[in-house]
């Protein structure tokens, strides 16, 4: 692996450790206020776009959005719409299964909660009209810092360039730049509690960190 890749990995790890520590320092009350603000902005977006299918995730621990996010989204979607949630595979790629209510979730590895319905396959996310992903940080180019497994980079690579992709953040996690590797995939927008929906169009839709707009 080239030396610059090792440096990027180290820089990512250091940034991730610092930001996750800041998340853990938030009080339960602060997390609840932030979750409510993020949910309200996302619900507004869902009601405006009215997607027939969207994908999201179940926030855990200090992740933005609150652990009731799937129920909030399901209530905001059109009655016949489908909400897909991720199922982590052994190879750290993501499969997708429909969410039908709290009783359709089970505890999974790494502290995750996943749907119990039969998975639809890794490519199911490509049929979503709105994709919501977690992130530890996102920069002004739209490039995200995740947990380090590459799961969502692989998922985002399957999403058509025209589909809106949104990362949920705490305040202070939309940053000027995150360390990147060529496989890193951007998002179109972020939602933060204070700023709401923010477009981050510095990387062309469908691009990776190795191909930025104008290059």
Give, region by region, the residue ranges found by the protein language model.
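N-terminal active-site beta-alpha-beta segment that forms phosphate/nucleotide-binding
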Residues: 2-126
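Conserved phosphate- and dinucleotide-binding cores of soluble alpha/beta proteins
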Residues: 2-5, 92-215
